[in-house]
Amino acid sequence: MSATYDDFQKLDIRVGRITRAEPFPEARKPAYRLWVDLGPEIGEKKSSAQITKHYTPEDLIGRQVLAVVNFPPRQIGPVMSEVLVLGVPDDEGEVVLIVPDKDVPVGGRMY
């Protein structure tokens, strides 16, 4: 399957900062509930992320992440996930977050 640059432009991927993280015991697979500040234009949004192997809730607070903000909300158990926090698999298939390598303003759009 191929994609064009125009396809990529349809994705609204923004920098956010995790403001709150807590275990999500109702999820089918181990996960956290996340609250992500995406700046004044978008505000704070909720997400669910299966990132429990490499991160604790305490590790996540204040961490910058990349998130897709223009997918429709998705019901995950009792949580309505509003953004998709992005990650890649490590050698064992566990999620590692994609993050800016320097602190940048929240809400910035990836291009």
Give short role names for the model-derived ranges.
Residues M1-Y111:
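Phosphate-backbone binding interfaces of nucleic-acid-interacting proteins
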